[in-house]
């Protein structure tokens, strides 16, 4: 933290209209900071009935800001979001991958476009309602730690943040558990105290994912096959399926199958537009032993090349897995201590040293004993 007192320290809070960011603003105000609330409009989400959830969310921001006595603004990042997040989202699906727009949104919008805007407002820091913690060393190095609420920890989505971004960021909810955040909101009588949490990708909201994606990318139906070459039917388009997926295949008890085990997506081949399926949660083709990833970013300064044994997550809320990472610039090879199920190209692999989130990269390809897994 700077040598300024809280009263001299301006913190611009990203307020979404949800309970987490509302309590973030409240706590900072109670601690004596000079707080400004900012609502980011990242997507035109007007539905076919002319209803825009962003309008309702902004009303909630205004109500909470008025209640706690802080000024508030709205800023439009629709163009930045389209260019930096949505175009990436579509490009990944075109490439047969499964993107993670939340990771990209934090990297490009909430901690870049928003951070820049906050600095124009004279901010010393930005703050968000994410469940993560920061610890600063005497030399000024900032470490990003998991949130105290293990069920809500969001460091996975914040893994692409840089040291420069973290030095200007506060996470006031990091030491709290979610039920306590709700209690604080209710005790303060905040307008958002009972508002349910938003889930899913912000620009899709409650819409049907298949229908939404089909509006932007033409679906290309193709063959659904087993790895032995047995045809199992047709798929609706590779972009609608992810590695390890069970539902939506439409192949129940048929084709003289030998067991009653459910069917899963075990592979994709973009060149032939084939979806590969197999029976059993633990199908051998779902397991790999290493991966290559790119766009590697660390939360603090690291050497250009090094090897390290640490733990990793390959998706949100997954148990940590022991790994050895081999870093070369912005690329990394990750060897798993034991085989891992359903590694998904396009998703983030995030590295941890105990409680500290070291950073992350985007998965390009998975291997099983040096053999490329046909996952895209």
From Swiss-Prot:
Binding locations of ATP: 14-21, 40, 129
Pfam families for the chain: tRNA_Me_trans (PF03054), tRNA_Me_trans_C (PF20258), tRNA_Me_trans_M (PF20259)
Superkingdom of the organism of origin: Bacteria
Keywords attached to this entry: ATP-binding, Cytoplasm, Disulfide bond, Nucleotide-binding, RNA-binding, Transferase, tRNA processing, tRNA-binding
Biological process terms in GO annotation: tRNA wobble position uridine thiolation
Region (Interaction with target base in tRNA): 100-102
Annotated catalytic residues: 105, 202
Known catalytic reactions: S-sulfanyl-L-cysteinyl-[protein] + uridine(34) in tRNA + AH2 + ATP = 2-thiouridine(34) in tRNA + L-cysteinyl-[protein] + A + AMP + diphosphate + H(+)
Class in the EC hierarchy, top level: transferase
Record PANTHER family: MITOCHONDRIAL TRNA-SPECIFIC 2-THIOURIDYLASE 1 (PTHR11933:SF5), TRNA 5-METHYLAMINOMETHYL-2-THIOURIDYLATE -METHYLTRANSFERASE (PTHR11933)
Protein function: Catalyzes the 2-thiolation of uridine at the wobble position (U34) of tRNA, leading to the formation of s(2)U34.
Family: Belongs to the MnmA/TRMU family.
Protein name, per record: tRNA-specific 2-thiouridylase MnmA
Species the sequence originates in: Lactococcus lactis subsp. cremoris (strain MG1363)
Gene (name only): mnmA
């Amino acid at each position: 933290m700077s040598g300024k007192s809280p009263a001299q320290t301006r913190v611009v809070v990203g307020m979404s209209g949800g309970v987490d960011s509302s309590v973030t603003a409240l706590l900072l105000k109670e601690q004596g900071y000079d707080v400004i609330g900012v609502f980011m409009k990242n997507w035109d989400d007007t539905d076919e009935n002319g209803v825009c959830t962003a309008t309702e969310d902004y009303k909630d921001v205004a109500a909470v800001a008025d209640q706690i006595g802080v000024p508030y603004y709205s800023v439009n990042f629709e163009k930045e979001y389209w260019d930096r997040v949505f175009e990436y989202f579509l490009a990944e699906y075109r490439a047969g991958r499964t993107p993670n727009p939340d990771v990209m949104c934090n990297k490009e919008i909430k901690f870049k476009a928003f951070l820049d805007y906050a600095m124009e407002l004279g901010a010393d820091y930005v703050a968000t309602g994410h469940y993560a913690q920061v610890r600063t060393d005497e030399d000024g190095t900032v470490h990003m730690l998991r949130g105290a609420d293990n069920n809500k920890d969001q460091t996975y989505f914040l893994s692409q943040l840089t040291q420069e971004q973290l030095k200007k960021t506060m996470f006031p909810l990091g030491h709290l558990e979610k039920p306590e955040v709700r209690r604080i909101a209710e005790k303060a009588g905040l307008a958002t105290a009972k508002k349910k949490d938003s889930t899913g990708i912000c620009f899709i909201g409650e819409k049907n994912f298949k229908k939404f994606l089909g509006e932007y990318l033409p679906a290309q139906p193709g063959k659904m096959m087993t790895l032995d070459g047995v045809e199992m039917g047709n798929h609706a388009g590779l972009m609608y399926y992810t590695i390890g997926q069970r539902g939506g295949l439409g192949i129940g008890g048929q084709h003289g199958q030998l067991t009653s085990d459910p069917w899963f997506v075990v592979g994709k081949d973009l060149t032939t537009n084939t979806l590969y399926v197999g029976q059993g949660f633990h199908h051998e083709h779902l397991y790999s032993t290493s991966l290559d990833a790119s766009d590697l970013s660390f939360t603090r300064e690291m050497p250009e090349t090094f090897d390290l044994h640490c733990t990793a997550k390959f998706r949100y809320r997954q148990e940590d897995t022991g790994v050895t990472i081999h870093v070369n610039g912005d690329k990394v090879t990750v060897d798993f201590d034991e085989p891992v199920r359903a590694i998904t190209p396009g998703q983030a692999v995030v590295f941890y040293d105990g409680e500290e989130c070291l950073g992350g990269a985007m998965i390009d390809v998975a291997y099983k004993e040096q053999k490329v897994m046909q996952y895209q």
